[in-house]
């Protein structure tokens, strides 16, 4: 007769045989599949975050530049409008698109709207200039509102002088148009200078007009335009005021530099990852924004820049560095939605672009590069 303990053993063995072979790797495979599925979900989440970040950047740029829509300027128009002048070439050639300054200093710029540094203004037509003596004259400049509310540091009028065949002395005169006086006077002098030119190519000449510009800003009604003359010894005018064939980009223009004082704020620290990272915590990932891919030809430089974005989890176990958020959760765990992975430090980019008035602006746009991410 079989005793009870032995009978239990037989029953257990019978159940094992009936159940079939046991796969000892089943649990590990299940765990691997769960982990793989989690990584795929993380990749999809990051892809959605990248797309959202790019769309947000487009909206932010227009908003920070105070543009309702992207300026509609064709590539042909850009080639004609871009002056072939030293200050613009210098901006493009020595262009500091962005710098990785996430480790220097403890303060950062966090103002919202773009801080303008240089504005290049092209001349426009004026009814007053057309009526002066029955034919067009140059030049009339309209000024962006950015200039009126910022401190003018420098204002230069740039004019291009055509090449000469023999050495000559050139007398340059800049006249400001005024309302006709009783004696018929319609002009008053701004600047005059004498320079020697040698045979060869034409040259760019700059003239300080800061005082005149400041007066125009104080009394906009006094801005009726200017007339430019550059006469050689034979009375020939060498100044390019209305470019002819082969003279595209040689228009006179104003280069105005302004300054603004941005606000400052404190910084913190965060994790850096790449697209192949398996890090689940809140982290900064690389992202390059290509303006040419948008069809935004109105942005002269940069054509692309590194924007970066934040993605990852913000579990409360990671919150040793964020005690205020942790305390809120402890006080009301059901009512707290938890922290989000978000930029904790951002830096500006410099941008050279056309605004809606076909003026060339060189400015600094704040908070366009994610330098660090964190949970908050």
Curated annotation (Swiss-Prot):
Glycosylation sites: 72
Post-translation changes: Synthesized as large precursor molecule that undergoes proteolytic cleavage to generate an N-terminal propeptide and a disulfide linked C-terminal dimer, which is the biologically active molecule. The circulating form consists of a latent complex of the C-terminal dimer and other proteins, including its propeptide, which maintain the C-terminal dimer in a latent, inactive state. Ligand activation requires additional cleavage of the prodomain by a tolloid-like metalloproteinase.
UniProt keyword annotations, A-Z: Cleavage on pair of basic residues, Cytokine, Disulfide bond, Glycoprotein, Growth factor, Heparin-binding, Secreted, Signal
GO terms under biological process: cellular response to dexamethasone stimulus; cellular response to hypoxia; muscle cell cellular homeostasis; myoblast migration involved in skeletal muscle regeneration; negative regulation of insulin receptor signaling pathway; negative regulation of muscle hypertrophy; negative regulation of myoblast differentiation; negative regulation of myoblast proliferation
Site (Cleavage): 99-100
Pro-piece positions: 25-267
Cystine crosslinks: 273-283, 282-341, 310-373, 314-375
One GO cellular component, as annotated: extracellular space
Subcellular location: Secreted
Purpose: Acts specifically as a negative regulator of skeletal muscle growth.
Entry protein name: Growth/differentiation factor 8
Organism of provenance: Rattus norvegicus
Phylogenetic lineage: Eukaryota, Metazoa, Chordata, Craniata, Vertebrata
Gene name, Swiss-Prot/TrEMBL: Mstn
């Amino acid at each position: 007769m079989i005793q009870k303990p032995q009978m239990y053993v037989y029953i257990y063995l019978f159940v094992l045989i009936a159940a079939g072979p046991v796969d000892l790797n089943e649990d590990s495979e299940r765990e691997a599949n769960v982990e793989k599925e989690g990584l795929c979900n993380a990749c999809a989440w990051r892809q959605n975050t990248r797309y959202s970040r790019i769309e947000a950047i487009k909206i932010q740029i227009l908003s920070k530049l105070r543009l309702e829509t992207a300026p509609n300027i064709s590539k042909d128009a850009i080639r004609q409008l871009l002056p072939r002048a030293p200050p613009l070439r210098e901006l493009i050639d020595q262009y500091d698109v962005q710098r990785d300054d996430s480790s220097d200093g403890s303060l950062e710029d966090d103002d919202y709207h773009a801080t303008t540094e240089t504005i290049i203004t092209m001349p426009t037509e004026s009814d007053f200039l057309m009526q002066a003596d029955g034919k067009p004259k140059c030049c009339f400049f309209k000024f962006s509102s950015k200039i009126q509310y910022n401190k003018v540091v420098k204002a230069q009028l740039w004019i291009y002088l055509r090449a000469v065949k023999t050495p000559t002395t050139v007398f340059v005169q800049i006249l400001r148009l005024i309302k006709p006086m009783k004696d018929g006077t319609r002009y008053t002098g701004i600047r005059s200078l004498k320079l020697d030119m040698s045979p060869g190519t034409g040259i760019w000449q700059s003239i300080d007009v800061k005082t005149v510009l400041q007066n125009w800003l104080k009394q906009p009604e006094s801005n009726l335009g200017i007339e430019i003359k550059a006469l050689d010894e034979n009375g020939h005018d060498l100044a390019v005021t209305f470019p002819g064939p082969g003279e595209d980009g040689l228009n006179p223009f104003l280069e105005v530099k302004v300054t603004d004082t941005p606000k400052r704020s404190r910084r913190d620290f965060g994790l850096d990852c790449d697209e192949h990272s398996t890090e689940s915590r809140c982290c900064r990932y690389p992202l390059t924004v290509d303006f040419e891919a948008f069809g935004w030809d109105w942005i002269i430089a940069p054509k692309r820049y590194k924007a970066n974005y934040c993605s990852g989890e913000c579990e409360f176990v990671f919150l040793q560095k964020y005690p205020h958020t942790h305390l809120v959760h402890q006080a009301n765990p059901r009512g707290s939605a938890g922290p989000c992975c978000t930029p904790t430090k951002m830096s500006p980019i410099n941008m050279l672009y056309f605004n809606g008035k076909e003026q060339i602006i060189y400015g600094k746009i704040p908070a366009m590069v994610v330098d660090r991410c964190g949970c908050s």
